[in-house]
Amino acid sequence: MSMLEQMGKAAKQASWQLAMLSTAKKNQALAVIANLLESESQAILQANEQDMAAARDSGMSEALLDRLLLSPARLAAIANDVRQVCRLNDPVGRVIDGSLLDSGLKLERRRVPLGVIGVIYEARPNVTIDVASLCLKTGNAVILRGGKETHHTNQATVKVIQQALEQCGLPPAAVQAIESPDRELVTQLLRMDNYIDMLIPRGGAGLHKLCREQSTIPVITGGIGVCHTFVDESADFEKALLVIENAKIQRPSACNSLETLLVHQEIAARFLPILSDRMHAFGVTLHASPQAMPFLAEGKARVVAVEAADYDDEWLSLDLNVEIVADINAAISHIREHGTSHSDAILTRSLGNAEHFVRAVDSSAVYVNASTRFTDGGQFGLGAEVAVSTQKLHARGPMGLDALTTYKWIGYGDDLVRS
């Protein structure tokens, strides 16, 4: 039996035990994890420093370095996220619906854990803890495969999680990590459908494509965020600029940050010079369409010509595409062609245009007069998210606790037989 098969078998056995746990027991384990993350923070941060040093030496981009970094403040926030998961309602055992049938059978549909979750991710050390906490809360075991960039950080955090599980009398195999950087192990993992019930990739487009094409396990894809905001002709300029600032500048490396701004042609001459000045203050480079270029050049920001391929890629940096569109339908057409079904927004004072945009844009999250940065499990009140799904089955948008469960039908009878 291979190393991966041994992990899969241990995870499956652990999942049976987890499925039987009370909410109180699961919360106890999560509380111990949060406490140990703080008490063992020095070891985790030192491990992260090793990963950061190696990443810098390899020439990793600033956007990815930001994703890789664990600061004391970020680690403290992650520990608090685990405590927030403790406070969330446990979906396991919840009766979704039920009825008494004419046959006398009392039928109900009840939420249950999925079983074993596999998660493949890249330079995102927070994923280790976020995913583990959500899986434990929902009674699922998890096998993690982080990128080589996060090797030392993942080792340190999984060690803390397994220590907490043992302290609570739970199987450490409930949370396991594949430590070898061998890429062949990813291919093997994708075919372990006899042990793993759902696979979640969190990384670039290449990883998602690999999982879709080679996995024999049901895959939840998403997280690629070419997010748009359309500034309608009725938008309030100052309020619109505040939303754009938040969406682009708060955390440019996040998948829900703004990548392309679409501006109605009727306001372009007045709005774009102001936008250019505002973006200059934050060091944003504007990638302008030929129509937008002269208006943006009136402001102070650095402006370069947009390339056709720019509309289809995430910048994950202080760069923003700017395009002028004829009307709301042209904006919708642009989003349909270049969007990734993640998060898109309209800034408008027209109720009719707002409703038209919401109905026409087929993304997992659509906003009216709000920043795309809200697409987040914590912001949605779901707790730490396991991923943002941009597909329509089995989950869509930020995946919280409910998305890590399925359901079973349970029938109660009094020695009933079918007639």
From Swiss-Prot:
Pfam families noted in UniProt: Aldedh
GO biological process per UniProt: L-proline biosynthetic process
Pathway annotation from the record: Amino-acid biosynthesis; L-proline biosynthesis; L-glutamate 5-semialdehyde from L-glutamate: step 2/2
Signal peptide span: none
Subcellular localization: Cytoplasm
EC supergroup of this enzyme: oxidoreductase
Catalytic activity: L-glutamate 5-semialdehyde + phosphate + NADP(+) = L-glutamyl 5-phosphate + NADPH + H(+)
CDD domains in the record: ALDH_F18-19_ProA-GPR (cd07079)
UniProt KW keywords: Amino-acid biosynthesis, Cytoplasm, NADP, Oxidoreductase, Proline biosynthesis
GO molecular function, one term: glutamate-5-semialdehyde dehydrogenase activity
EC number(s) per entry: 1.2.1.41
Acetylation in keyword set: no
InterPro entries per the UniProt record, alphabetical: Ald_DH/histidinol_DH (IPR016161), Ald_DH_C (IPR016163), Ald_DH_N (IPR016162), Aldehyde_DH_dom (IPR015590), G-glutamylP_reductase_CS (IPR020593), Glu-5-SA_DH (IPR012134), GPR_dom (IPR000965)
GO cellular component: cytoplasm
Function: Catalyzes the NADPH-dependent reduction of L-glutamate 5-phosphate into L-glutamate 5-semialdehyde and phosphate. The product spontaneously undergoes cyclization to form 1-pyrroline-5-carboxylate.
Family: Belongs to the gamma-glutamyl phosphate reductase family.
NCBIfam families: PRK00197.1, proA
PANTHER family according to UniProt: DELTA-1-PYRROLINE-5-CARBOXYLATE SYNTHASE (PTHR11063:SF8), GLUTAMATE SEMIALDEHYDE DEHYDROGENASE (PTHR11063)
Protein name as it appears in the record: Gamma-glutamyl phosphate reductase
